[in-house]
Amino acid sequence: MSAQMFESFKVNSPNVKYTDEHIISDYTYQTTKVQNVNGELIVEPVDQKYIFKTERKVPRMGVMIVGLCGNNGTTVVGGVIANREGLCWNTKQGLQTPNYFGSVVMSSTIRMGMDENGCDAYIPLKNLIPMVHPNDIVFGGWDINNANLADAMQRAQVFDYDLQVQLIPHMKNITPLPSIYFPDFIAANQKDRANNVLTGTKKEQMEQIRKDIRDFKESNKLDTVVVMWSANTERFSSLVPGVNDTIENLMAAIDRSEEEISPSTLFAVASILENTTYINGSPQNTFVPAVVDLAIQHNVSIGGDDFKTGQTKIKSVLTDYLVSAGIKPVSIVSYNHLGNNDGKNLSAPQQFRSKEITKSNVVDDMIASNNILYKQGEHPDHVIVIKYVPYVGDSKRAMDEYTSQIFMGGHNTIVLHNTCEDSLLAAPIILDLVILAEVTSRITMKKQDDDQFATFHPVLSLLSYLLKAPIVPKHATVVNALFKQRACIENIFKACVGIAPDNNMLLEQRL
């Protein structure tokens, strides 16, 4: 039976109400509570009634990218311009048309149910609840290099030449704002690019970033702004008592230009103080405890860490499959080489260490889920190597070897080779992150007996699907398994319109 595709839908239920301003849904959340009682697992099914309220008006949104003139920044902006203007270009494969492939928001569908003939019905994810369209986003941002976006796009060598020629008139007048540059935090080989930097104390530079955000919002008549870090990977910041452990200590440390206050931390603090969502697309520990506490205090959304594009996304799928199948991965070896500026920066040991940490942790929750395969504290050998090879440019090569124990002492080895067009994979993820972060700000919910609606926790774990090392609220579970992360997005948005999660039981076809 073939699937049916629809662009829109109507929910026929007394539990869903559409007003001019809101979608209001009465939703029964079914979950399971467990207790360990004297070594016995007691399982209790729980039904909890919630009310979801989603604002229908889509705001005029701007995105400010830190690292605007990098490969990711130019690819995002150029890709959106090509889609908005309908630019087509020729390659040796023929005429190419713009699209948003690789975006879960723009190019994926969700199953809504089954008709009387057993045919599944799907709609685009972007049509489930009102969302910002990428074509309507206003872009700006900062960079330590002063190249205009047309020159930076040509330097990146990501787009085909014919498309670059058509984009130049649209991008040549876009220039980056001066950015924060502390040489100690990124590789020394980035110094020759740093010709567009702020000066002054750390407090003065942070205040300038705040002013930039305000000016950008006002000059473009925006309702909301998201700040996205897509700049160089920084080294990890040391967690120092009296410096970045509490809000008060952090603000005082900024006032005295403390050495361990990184550029990304200053951008995060500036964004939070301007009531602006901040997302960290690189692996460094921007979100030190004081920054997280500041976001919670101001109820400003933050998300991170590190875009999940090629190799890591496959790793989270493959490891989940192996462990779920009762197969025991005992060795995971991942090798990468790339030639873009990200690879150049990561060739420095301290910056590589930041990346190594986020890429290593991606299998942890899957390993911990199966104590039949793994004893307490047992973990696969997991090695990550990244090398800089200038000639391959943005075309990152990833090679992985998975060795697993199977039945009766046997071994299975899986070897993968993955050519990742790095920025072409990252750009749609950047769009997904900012669109999903915005839409969550328009969703409030409450338990049926509560008086007040509440927003999502400021630490946006909902974005985990798109990030290598997702940050979550304190004491919350970190989920890295990819399909669980995808189901979370889908099912929360379904709850907003009163639709049950897709449990795949298909009981109507089992009898």
Swiss-Prot record:
According to the UniProt entry, its GO molecular function terms are: inositol-3-phosphate synthase activity
Q: Which residues form a coiled coil?
A: none
Q: What is this protein called?
A: Inositol-3-phosphate synthase
Pathway(s) the chain acts in: Polyol metabolism; myo-inositol biosynthesis; myo-inositol from D-glucose 6-phosphate: step 1/2
Q: Which SUPFAM superfamilies match?
A: Glyceraldehyde-3-phosphate dehydrogenase-like, C-terminal domain, NAD(P)-binding Rossmann-fold domains
Gene name of the encoded protein:
ino1
Which positions does UniProt annotate for NAD(+) binding?
70-72, 143, 179-180, 190, 193, 230-233, 281-282, 306, 309, 340-342, 355, 393-394, 422-423
Task: Give the UniProt family note.
Answer: Belongs to the myo-inositol 1-phosphate synthase family.
- What are the subcellular locations of this protein? Cytoplasm
Predominant place of localization: cytoplasm
Q: Origin organism of this chain? A: Dictyostelium discoideum
Query: Which controlled-vocabulary keywords does the entry list?
Result: Cytoplasm, Inositol biosynthesis, Isomerase, Lipid biosynthesis, Lipid metabolism, NAD, Phospholipid biosynthesis, Phospholipid metabolism
Catalytic function, reaction form: D-glucose 6-phosphate = 1D-myo-inositol 3-phosphate
Q: Does the keyword Transport apply?
A: no
EC numbers for this chain = 5.5.1.4
Query: GO biological process: any one?
Result: autophagy
Relate the protein's function as given in its record: Key enzyme in myo-inositol biosynthesis pathway that catalyzes the conversion of glucose 6-phosphate to 1-myo-inositol 1-phosphate in a NAD-dependent manner. Rate-limiting enzyme in the synthesis of all inositol-containing compounds.
Question: Which GO terms of the cellular component aspect does the record hold?
Answer: cytoplasm; cytosol
Listed InterPro entries: Myo-inos-1-P_Synthase, Myo-inos-1-P_Synthase_GAPDH, NAD(P)-bd_dom_sf
Q: Which PANTHER family match?
A: MYO-INOSITOL-1 PHOSPHATE SYNTHASE
